[in-house]
């Protein structure tokens, strides 16, 4: 290396023309080098193809699956007794001297009948009550029947009903009610707190834990806000009795929504009416069905129509003897309905008409121009709706100058019966079983008295009928897909009615996965 020659690492950058000279001196490509390059390219392409095929295969070809059945056990829940609560005695908001207007007391003792398909029914009164009836014959009664231990899935049928004819001072009339299962959510449609009308709310808790109850109240002017409607404690095996006027005074058309936590309850309204110095009847109003778009009310019994009409025309304060349909729909907006009044067996004058009302406000629709007879009322609405009918009865001697005994009943909507059901007929005058079939198919049902032979009843589509039954007896209804039923009692200046209840469920096995 000369003194002026730089080492390779220190060679200066070449100008473009010098690069061309360098390139010209590089070793030219030979056939062997071309072949090596070609093989490498082919190998790369083949590798890429293999990768592509592998990916496609993983997507398109089924992958092997591994499955196993998780361990499980078929468990039959411990069967529990069927249980219902009968409301107990008719109550008044005072003691037996007429004093103590903030307390309640019983007016006699109801007659209660009950039966079970197992043949065993236990009765026990609630042990506490605001009406001081705890542990007595006037208290609400819990009826229960044990399950079939050998077959827990068997549905045990249980039913009960009570009635009470009262004739004491301002309280005159007939009240009847079914015994009902407890619920955490129920609606009451009926009653009034207008002048001369007293309505009590009764809450019965047959469970072993206290129930905390909240109330929502609605009237003809909408929702009603009042202190004391939340956090109402109903003790275990206890009854609370509350004056509805304490929450909603001067309300003509109340509707009450009852919800509970902890223990579950049954809820009823008890209404009594006094017109001046004349008693105007009484009733026990049970819970109705939840809001629905198709509501069926069987058992509208129109008797002694001439006496009622005489009082309506000439007597002051008798306006609420008029048969009326009470409607309420939760929410907002306009509710469109079609109201149909259908005579039983095609006897009587029916009617059907459209009606609109505001959701969130209680509406009342007079039902006029009915002849004496029995009817089913049906409401088809575009919004889930609650409904009940008030009907009155007057003794034949009633006139505007000398009014005889009058009575009224609130007819709650019936629950659809979709399987074999049992009902007990309360004791009282001229009991009738009302059956309605609002469906589009004919129904053939069998009515069987306890220990008796069955009677087949054919009911065409859209028809209803009534059958005489025996007070205090229990009947089984079977052989149908869907129907509605109610029991009514009526005499001179007396009327009562209640809906049949569906059967309770058995203890079906359930599968538990571990």
Report each predicted region and the residues it spans.
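Terminal targeting segments of Actinobacterial cell-envelope proteins
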Residues: 1-39
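Conserved functional hotspot residues at active sites or interaction interfaces
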Residues: 34-51, 56-99, 163-202, 268-330, ...
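Extracytoplasmic/periplasmic/luminal assembly and interaction segments
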Residues: 92-138
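Extended, compositionally biased repeat/scaffold regions that form elongated interaction surfaces
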Residues: 178, 260, 283, 294-331, ...
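A charged, solvent-exposed segment within the mature domains of Sec-exported extracytoplasmic proteins
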Residues: 183-228, 233-240
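Short acidic, flexible loop segments centered on an aromatic residue
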Residues: 203-223, 260-261, 318-348, 380-381, ...
């Amino acid at each position: 290396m000369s003194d002026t020659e730089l080492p390779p690492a220190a060679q200066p950058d070449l100008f473009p023309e010098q690069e061309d000279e360098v390139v010209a001196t590089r070793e030219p490509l030979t056939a062997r080098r071309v072949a090596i390059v070609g093989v490498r390219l082919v190998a790369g392409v083949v590798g890429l193809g293999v990768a592509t095929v592998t990916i496609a295969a993983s997507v398109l070809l089924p992958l092997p699956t591994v499955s196993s059945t998780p361990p499980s056990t078929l468990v039959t829940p411990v069967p529990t007794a069927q249980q219902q609560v009968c409301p107990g005695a008719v109550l008044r908001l005072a003691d037996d001297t007429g004093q103590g207007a903030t307390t309640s007391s019983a007016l006699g003792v109801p007659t209660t009948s009950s039966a079970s398909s197992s043949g065993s029914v236990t009765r026990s009164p609630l042990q506490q009550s605001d009406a001081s009836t705890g542990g007595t014959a006037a208290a609400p009664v819990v009826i229960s029947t044990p399950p079939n231990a050998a077959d827990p899935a068997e549905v045990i049928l249980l039913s009960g009903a009570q009635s009470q004819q009262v004739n004491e001072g301002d309280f005159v009339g007939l009240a009847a009610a079914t015994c009902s299962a407890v619920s955490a959510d129920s609606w009451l449609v009926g009653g009034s707190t207008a002048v001369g009308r007293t309505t009590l709310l009764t809450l019965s808790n047959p469970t072993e834990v206290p129930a905390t109850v909240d109330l929502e109240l609605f009237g003809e002017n909408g929702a009603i806000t009042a202190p004391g409607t939340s956090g109402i404690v109903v003790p275990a095996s206890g009854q609370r009795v509350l004056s509805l006027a304490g929450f909603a005074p001067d309300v003509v058309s109340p509707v009450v929504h009852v919800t509970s936590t902890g223990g579950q309850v049954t809820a009823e309204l008890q209404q009594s009416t006094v017109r001046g110095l004349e008693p105007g009847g009484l009733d026990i109003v049970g819970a109705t069905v939840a809001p629905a778009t198709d509501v069926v009310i069987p058992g509208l019994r129109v008797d002694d129509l001439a006496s009622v009409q005489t009082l309506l025309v000439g007597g002051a304060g008798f306006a609420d003897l008029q048969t009326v349909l009470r409607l309420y729909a939760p929410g907002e907006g306009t509710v469109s309905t079609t109201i149909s009044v259908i005579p039983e067996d095609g006897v009587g004058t029916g009617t059907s008409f459209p009606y609109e009302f505001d959701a969130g406000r209680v509406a009342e629709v007079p039902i006029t121009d009915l002849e004496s007879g029995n009817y089913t009322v049906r409401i088809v609405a575009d919004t889930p709706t609650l409904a009940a009918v008030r009907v009155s009865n007057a003794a034949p001697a009633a006139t505007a100058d000398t009014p005889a005994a009058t009575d009224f009943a609130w007819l709650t909507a019936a629950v659809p019966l979709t399987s074999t059901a049992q009902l007990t007929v309360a004791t009282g005058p001229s009991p009738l079983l009302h059956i309605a079939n609002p469906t589009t198919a004919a129904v053939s049902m069998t009515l069987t008295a306890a220990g008796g032979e069955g009677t087949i009843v054919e009911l065409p589509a859209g028809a209803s009928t009534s059958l005489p039954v025996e007070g205090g007896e229990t009947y089984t209804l079977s052989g149908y897909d869907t129907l509605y039923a109610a029991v009514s009692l009526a005499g001179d200046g007396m009327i009562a009615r209640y809906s049949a209840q569906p059967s309770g469920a058995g203890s079906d096995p359930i599968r538990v996965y571990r």
